[in-house]
């Protein structure tokens, strides 16, 4: 190698000497070899010179090595935190810090190529990192709690996101209109930033909720809101960007609302139809005999919903979210047992890696993006505006939900009891405060900010980036303390996860087939791992008794019927039990609105989309209860 370099230099010297001999007026100087670092080499920091393929491959390898090292550090930190039972700090916060430290080192180092390679790329984010998170969220969605709290979720997600975007947009527009920092943006751009900063991403908080086993109702409301909120924020942002450079008129509001509703509805329909298509393919073919091919096809077809929707100028996130929900509701029960387990863990694995990569990217972006323009006052105003907007979106809407709940319950109970009843709030104040605290922003906002147009693009991008990092660190880092301060109910779900193979979903159904029992259970697509645990002994006893009175939750509470007359003996805890029973009764009344869809689903849709006897049930019916116990270990 050294001899080649020396020969190359000697050849160039001879060539230059001969050239000067022919043309002595030529003042060209000897140029360094491309293989050797010179003043124009990217190693020395000149960004205008292209690398040769070998050097480019070397720098790309170093960039990937750094990213993988950060990812390994984040996952190892997660293991350490889990082992030491440190639940106040989450790995996502550490991922941001790791990214910030390495980003600062890269920024201070000579050269630019590694810095350019690890810079946040919106195309990578939307096409590679975000889809696994959305798909897993829809697939792992607790459908029972989601549909039971659908009203609260929809109110927070749709009107709440709209209120948040409008409040943030108006505050930023007024601030920039004052001209204190020489920034002048249009109202459409201000609304675009408002939509960007309205995209919540409570990954950190929900992970802490899982560790503390927070009340599933609160978890579902925050989780469901964040799912729909991201999709709605993206649709709102794209709608606002269509009015960039145009004067804001009153008719623009109705035009924007129409575009939003059309985009959301068509995207939802695309996702549901593709999910149903997968269910029908699994039902009418024998692909389940080849689990590896089956798992690959399910994953790829699900991804197709995302890219097809984006290609049609719709929302890929909405399509992928509802495709995941439909896959779990219908296609799951047509899969082979191996594919059920494989798909579950593939989705979880990809989502976990993507989440950590995203937070590492956020930390790196603070220092590796050289074009960012930081305006401290604008950042402070933006941070205050998201708090004001979150307050306007949470507390008034919570009171509205409580009012609807109260009116409906009083009307429903008026025929049962003639006396006035005190209806508990559907969303108590401490739950409202926790929902407010869970409104931290995430990488979706940063990725959307990369699409902002105009002269002040990098100023607004820097503002969004700093606000996102601050909310993750401040709100995410103080969540554990807020759970104690607000006295949020924890420990609602057993620590033991006995559903790794998901045999707990189908084992009771197999017992019914073996014993010829006609007991109807809720262990179907509307149930999940958070459903009441039913043991074999309870199953045998409940055949001669009222089943709801014999099912106990992991927390020790019992579900009683409306005509419950047992246990009339004095009990110190009787009053608290009565309150819980009353709340269960009221909840049953309030959630009865979704019963029509469940009946329609059971009687019409499932016979069309599902096998009469799913393959999983066929496999489990040939085994004894002891076999299920042995396979779970």
UniProtKB/Swiss-Prot annotation:
A motif (Amiloride-binding) lies at residues 124-133. The modification Phosphoserine is found at residues 494, 499, 569. Keywords: Antiport, Endosome, Glycoprotein, Ion transport, Membrane, Phosphoprotein, Potassium, Potassium transport, Signal, Sodium, Sodium transport, Transmembrane, Transmembrane helix, Transport. One of its GO terms (biological process) is intracellular monoatomic cation homeostasis. Residues 1-21 form the signal peptide. Residues 31-42 have a biased composition (Low complexity). The keyword Nucleotide-binding does not apply. It is found in: Endosome membrane; Prevacuolar compartment membrane. GO terms for molecular function: potassium:proton antiporter activity; sodium:proton antiporter activity. One of its GO terms (cellular component) is fungal-type vacuole membrane. Residues 83-85, 139-152, 212-217, 280-288, 334-344, 365-376, 453-457 are cytoplasmic. Residues 564-574 have a biased composition (Polar residues). Its main location: membrane. Residues 25-44, 553-578 are annotated as: Disordered. Glycans are attached at residues 420, 515, 550, 563. Changing residue 357 to A/L/I: Impairs resistance to osmotic stress and hygromycin, and blocks protein-trafficking to the vacuole. The modification Phosphothreonine is found at residues 490, 498. Belongs to the monovalent cation:proton antiporter 1 (CPA1) transporter (TC 2.A.36) family. Interacts with CYP6. Present with 521 molecules/cell in log phase SD medium. Endosomal/prevacuolar electroneutral Na(+)/H(+) exchanger which mediates intracellular sequestration of Na(+) cations, regulates vacuolar pH and contributes to osmotolerance following sudden exposure to hyperosmotic media. Also contributes to the postdiauxic/stationary phase resistance to osmotic stress and allows for the continued growth of cells until the acquired osmotolerance response can occur. Involved in hygromycin resistance probably through its influence on the electrochemical proton gradient affecting secondarily the entrance of hygromycin. This is Endosomal/prevacuolar sodium/hydrogen exchanger.
């Amino acid at each position: 190698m050294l001899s080649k370099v020396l020969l190359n230099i000697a050849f160039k010297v001879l060539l230059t000497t001969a050239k000067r001999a022919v043309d002595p007026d030529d003042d060209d100087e000897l140029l360094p070899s491309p293989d050797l670092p010179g003043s124009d080499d990217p190693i020395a920091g000149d960004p205008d010179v292209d690398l040769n393929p070998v050097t480019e491959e070397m720098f790309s390898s170093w960039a990937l090595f750094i990213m993988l090292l950060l990812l390994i550090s984040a996952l190892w930190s997660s293991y350490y935190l889990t082992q030491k039972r440190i639940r106040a700090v989450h790995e996502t916060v550490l991922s941001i810090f790791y990214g910030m430290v390495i980003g600062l080192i890269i920024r201070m180092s000579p050269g630019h190529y590694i810095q350019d390679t690890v810079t946040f790329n919106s195309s990578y984010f939307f096409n590679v990192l975000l889809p696994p998170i959305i798909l897993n969220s829809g697939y792992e969605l607790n459908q029972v709690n989601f549909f039971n709290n659908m009203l609260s979720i929809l109110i927070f997600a749709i009107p709440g996101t709209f209120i948040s975007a409008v409040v943030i947009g108006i505050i930023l527009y007024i601030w920039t209109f004052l001209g204190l920092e020489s920034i002048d943006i249009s109202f459409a751009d201000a609304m675009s930033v408002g939509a960007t900063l309205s995209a919540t991403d409570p990954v950190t908080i929900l992970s802490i909720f899982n560790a503390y086993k927070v009340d599933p109702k609160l978890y579902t409301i925050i989780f469901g809101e964040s799912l729909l909120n991201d999709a709605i924020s993206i649709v709102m942002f794209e709608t606002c960007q269509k009015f960039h450079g145009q004067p804001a008129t009153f008719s623009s509001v109705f035009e924007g609302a129409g575009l939003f509703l059309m985009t959301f509805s068509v995207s939802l329909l695309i996702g549901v139809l593709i999910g149903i298509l997968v269910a029908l393919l699994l039902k009418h073919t024998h692909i389940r005999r080849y689990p590896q091919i089956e798992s690959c096809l399910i994953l790829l077809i699900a991804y197709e919903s995302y890219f097809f929707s984006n290609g049609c100028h719709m929302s890929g996130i909405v399509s992928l979210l509802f495709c995941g929900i439909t896959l779990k509701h219908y296609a799951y029960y047509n899969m082979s047992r191996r594919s059920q387990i494989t798909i579950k863990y593939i989705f979880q694995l990809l989502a976990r890696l993507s989440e950590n990569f995203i937070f590492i990217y956020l930390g790196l972006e603070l220092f590796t993006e050289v074009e960012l323009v930081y305006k401290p006052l604008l950042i402070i105003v933006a941070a205050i505006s998201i708090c004001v907007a979150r307050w306007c979106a949470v507390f008034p809407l919570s009171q509205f939900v409580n009012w609807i709940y109260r009116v409906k319950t009083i009307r429903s109970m008026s025929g049962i009891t003639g006396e006035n009843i005190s209806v508990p709030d559907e969303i108590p104040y401490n739950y409202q405060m926790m929902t407010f605290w869970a409104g931290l922003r995430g990488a979706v906002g940063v990725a959307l900010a990369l699409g902002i147009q105009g002269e002040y693009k990098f100023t607004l991008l820097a503002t969004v980036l700093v606000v996102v990092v601050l909310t993750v660190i401040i709100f995410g880092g103080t969540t554990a303390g807020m759970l104690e301060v607000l006295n949020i109910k924890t420990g609602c779900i057993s620590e033991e996860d006995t559903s790794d193979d998901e045999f707990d979903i189908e084992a009771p159904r197999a017992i019914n087939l073996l014993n010829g029992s006609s007991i109807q259970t809720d262990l179907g697509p509307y149930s999940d791992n958070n459903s009441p645990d039913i043991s074999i002994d309870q199953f045998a006893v409940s055949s001669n008794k009222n089943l709801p009175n014999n099912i106990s939750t992991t927390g020790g509470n019992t579900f009683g019927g409306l005509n419950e007359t047992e246990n009339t003996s004095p009990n110190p805890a009787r009053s608290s039990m009565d309150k819980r029973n009353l709340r269960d009764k009221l909840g049953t009344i309030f959630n009865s609105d979704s019963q029509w869809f469940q009946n329609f689903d059971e009687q019409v849709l499932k016979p069309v989309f599902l096998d009469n006897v799913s393959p999983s049930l066929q496999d489990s019916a040939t085994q004894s209860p002891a076999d299920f116990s042995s396979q779970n270990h």
